[in-house]
Regions:
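Acidic, histidine-bearing metal-coordination/catalytic regions of metal-dependent phosphoesterases
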Residues: 1-35, 186-215
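Core catalytic region of metal-dependent phosphoesterases/phosphodiesterases
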Residues: 7-10, 14-16, 21-130
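Conserved beta-sheet core of the metallophosphoesterase superfamily
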Residues: 105-215
Length: 215
């Protein structure tokens, strides 16, 4: 895969994970302070307007729950956000987005279920599937992207950061580990690269269990 190397001076770079649009369970809605699925979608869509037409978004999985009509509508609205480019990492709730990926695979002649190709851009959009993990570079710094928090990563002792989502335990911050959680629970909005740099390694910043949220 072609190396993704970005300069923060050229555009804003945003991160988000675990939008869980369409998820109607109280253990997700409650901690996020939403009354219902529609309120969750309305607020999420409003917050995503922070991302401008010249900006880059990295979406770290679990965008929508299920593959029903409403979930697919939510998914396509996110896919077609008017930003310069959006890169997607697989999560663990993939039904809806998997359907869109399979459409892309069939269009390039990949019909076998066990064959994957990355990067792959969804039709007439700036939305690109990157796979299950990616290493990118921002201002020369390596950044490891994964839906799941991992214990060790490439260049871990040389300033490389790890940005993830999907936390089912409260992982306390550690200044020795440049790891930070982009899940929706943290800010209830996308988080921009400069803010990530300010907060990573702060022991007061932790990865919240997204079934419990942040007080």
């Amino acid at each position: 895969m072609k190396k993704i190397s970005l300069k923060s001076a050229d555009q804003k770079i945003w991160f988000v994970s675990d939008l869980h649009l369409g998820h109607d369970k109280p253990f997700i809605l409650g901690p996020r302070k939403y009354q219902n699925v529609n309120e969750a979608y309305t607020h999420t869509h409003e917050m995503l307007k922070m991302i401008g037409p010249d900006d880059i978004l990295f979406n770290l999985g679990d965008m929508v729950i299920g593959a029903g009509a409403n979930s697919m509508e939510y998914a396509k609205r996110i896919v077609y956000l008017p930003c310069k480019h959006q890169y997607f990492i697989w999560g663990n709730h993939n039904a809806g987005i998997q359907q869109m990926y399979d459409e892309c695979r069939s269009e390039v002649g990949l019909l076998a279920d066990d064959i994957e190709i990355y990067p792959l851009t969804y039709r007439n959009s700036n939305f690109t599937f990157l796979g299950h993990r990616a290493e990118i570079f921002i201002d020369g710094r390596a950044v490891i992207l994964d839906h799941y928090p991992i214990a060790s990563w490439n260049h871990i002792g040389k300033g490389a950061m790890h940005i993830h989502g999907h936390t089912h335990l409260n992982l306390q911050g550690d200044k020795r580990l440049l790891r930070i959680d982009a899940s929706w629970e943290w800010k209830r909005r996308p988080v921009e690269w400069s803010e990530m740099l300010r907060e990573v390694g702060d022991k007061k910043v932790f990865s919240p269990d997204h079934h419990c949220g942040v007080e």
